[in-house]
Amino acid sequence: MATIAFHLLSAVGLRIGENHKRSLGSPSRRLSVSVTAFSSDQWRFPDHEQRSAKSFWDYLDAARDFIRPEHNSPSRWFSPLETKAPCHGSPLLLFLPGIDGNGLGLIRQHQKLGQMFDIWCLHIPPSNRSTFTDLVEMVETTVQSENQRSPGKPIYLVGESLGACIALAVAACNPQIDLVLILSNPATSFGNSSLQHLAPLVKVLPDQLDLAFPSVLSLIPGGPIKRMIAHWVRGLPENETAANIYQDLVTTSSFTSILADTFRRETLLWKLMLLDAAALFANAHLHLVQAQTLILSSGNDQILPSTCEGKRLRKKLPKCEVRSFKDNGHCLFLEDGIDLVSIIKATSFYRRGSHQDYISDYIPPTISEFNKCYGVNRLLEVIMGPVFLSTTEDGKMVRGLGGIPSEGPVLLVGNHMLLASDKISLPGQFVHERNINLRPLVHPMMFTRLKDGLLPDVSVYDTLRMMGSVPISATHLHNLLSAKSHILLFPGGIREALHRKGEEYKLMWPEKAEFVRAAAKFGAKIVPFCGVGEDDFLRVVVDYNDQIKVPIVKEVLKSVTAEGPVVR
């Protein structure tokens, strides 16, 4: 039987880490996604990563066709052409725009999102004077209709600023419908922003004063100076940097008239009144929202106090998580480096059915996502210097993971080293060396909290979730084995990772190893492994037994323990 040994040469500084338009009529195609191992010798880029990425200026170019002179033209749904056909069984995603209203806020995300969702975008023409109630009723009608058509699937509402308020209102009025809300910089904070004082100022200014261009420029992510700095940091040649900045300036100037048409004086006044009504309604009905919610807050939002608002909504909504982006501005989805698909995958917010299925709903990371996940741990890898040894079927010990079976189901069972640093190294090494997507079974506290407290936020575990970690349970082990996955199991759990003085290399496994029976049921290969080295370099100075002797620390430990779910 194949075995694997895992050595840490050194370990220093470790830490724990028409109002109803159908989508395009092309035949549906299935996106083939492996949940165990990739078939090729090299990790392939998905189709959507091979295409050139769209920029903010593509957004402006597309906006030209969405600005019409018609008086009070109706709001409507449209499906982006570049999304083509989603994979089989994909849920519906309704994008609800911000104050611009054109519905193109996800243009930089369309290609990747189109692989996972059936995307509809709401377009609110500049001349449209629908009230907030009208917009809520329109979205509500669509949600109810699609829920009747596909009752077993969730409906995603992705909204920014104004659209986030619409999404909250629809969720509050329809608690019986399975909705997933992804809200970027919600305008529920309008009452605490400087925007509320803008309407009286606009009313008293002369008609000849054109406010459109400076107002819209404040919404544009990454002005010329910021973009120039970004180009310099990336190490572009000076002449190329100058060319990029010149193109930015020329493009901005060319679209002045388009931006002005979007935010005429009367339109701006209407939008401000709309935001005021939206914030009042949404805030008054927050207690009715039961939908699963993800708040995306920009730390550099110059329009709304989004950071504080994200924290407030986290306390108000029962099923809410928050992700913060401290260096980004108001138009989050249009900024460089923001990938909504990666955010959804890392937060485990993607599902095709009424409940989260960590096997069928899981989509492995792309090569760029993998590099981003493990880039932050590269220094730790260098410091630890892990060495992997495995035994082939003929009993020969080889360096690397050559002895690990390629075909699943395979169950790797081993010991936790101090602070569970092994959970960082093992999945990455399997990808680098064998192109195998290892599925670790981890403590449920990495996915949920029973209450807020001293434990680190679940966002610190986004990397592990992106790489395929699954909350440990008998059901999940059964499903992973049936899917022929490569599974990583530490029977000793967190108790073994936080072992006490004198417990170096001591196994703390349960008396009944139920995983053996489960593996036998599916004919899985059990690969035992051991991790050694870390306990030879680190010593536990103060352990749990010492800490509980201090009354204050004892109470803190009890409080922390109560925050997370109990496994056994």
PLM region spans:
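N-terminal chloroplast transit peptides
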Residues: 1-30, 35-37
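Catalytic active-site module of serine/aspartate enzymes centered on a nucleophile-bearing elbow/loop
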Residues: 2, 7-12, 44, 48-72, ...
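Active-site loop/oxyanion-hole signature of alpha/beta-hydrolase fold enzymes
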Residues: 10, 107, 117-158, 172
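Conserved HGGG/HGGXW glycine-rich cap/lid loop of the alpha/beta-hydrolase fold
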Residues: 42, 48, 54-129
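Conserved serine/cysteine hydrolase catalytic core
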Residues: 85-87, 262-315, 321-326
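Acidic catalytic loop of the alpha/beta-hydrolase fold
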Residues: 101, 299-304, 330, 419
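Flexible "cap/lid" loop of the alpha/beta hydrolase fold
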Residues: 172, 176-227
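Catalytic core of membrane glycerolipid acyltransferases/transacylases, capturing the structured
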Residues: 408-477, 482-483, 494-510, 551
